[in-house]
Amino acid sequence: MARRRKYEGLNPFVAAGLIKFSEEGELERIKLNPRTAILVSITVIIAILVLNILHPL
């Protein structure tokens, strides 16, 4: 029988080869303050609500 490799401590996506890393800090390209993320989310929600009120489907 074939032996299965054990990927201990790895993310399943990395183990499956779906994500390829060339450098360790590659995912940290976008630095976003949590307060900014919340404000952008609230702004988008308010914009959607206002557009829904102005032009209902």
From Swiss-Prot:
It is a single-pass membrane protein. GO terms for biological process: protein transport. Residues 1-33 are cytoplasmic. The chain crosses the membrane at residues 34-55. The keyword Cytoplasm does not apply. Disulfide bonds: none annotated. It is found in: Cell membrane. Pfam families: Sec61_beta (PF03911). Keywords: Cell membrane, Membrane, Protein transport, Translocation, Transmembrane, Transmembrane helix, Transport. The keyword Transmembrane applies. HAMAP family: SecG. Belongs to the SEC61-beta family. NCBIfam families: PRK01253.1. This is Preprotein translocase subunit SecG. The lineage of its organism: Archaea, Thermoproteota, Thermoprotei, Thermoproteales, Thermoproteaceae.
